[in-house]
Amino acid sequence: MSLSPGTRLGPYEIVEPIGSGGMGDVYRARDTRLERDVAVKVLPERVARDAEARMRFEREAKAVAALTHPNILAIHDYGSEGGSAFSVTELLEGETLRRRINAGAMPWRKAAEIGAAIADGLAAAHAKGIIHRDLKPENIFLTTDGRVKILDFGIAQLVRADPPPPSDTDPTALPTAPMKTDPGSVIGTAGYMAPEQLR
């Protein structure tokens, strides 16, 4: 389902489409409360209709929102409106790592800088018990001002089963159970999976 300019999802007014993929359609939108531009991802209708999938989406949104890190796309909000489930993130300008790779070789130093930034972001996620599960060039974004952002934790897995002991409680820790994947199912992009995911 595509949204027309001017469509409202709560306080967010759709401006124009900026991308689409298996995890939903992405739009440039205006936050009418805070008067800022944002990106709104509208999830596929099957997610919006499925109560369990919607709860999983909300859990993931909360998990990623706890990851305040310069190399992870910031989530501002999530919700549902008129049968559409959506998330709201910071709006980025630039290109994906896939597009940059397709444009030709880059200097080794630049490639190393990008790799280090990705590793920093993943380390922050892993410290909170979150595994991305679909890391690939299409999910890495290079902004026009030189930042590296990891996108689309939409199939992330929460691996921390129990909250930390009270003495070690981190106010941003995730007191949530692990996400469940159906037995025998494979999640991610085959060419970028770790071997143990394919077993």
PLM region descriptions:
Residues 1-199:
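Conserved ATP-binding/catalytic core of the eukaryotic-like protein kinase fold
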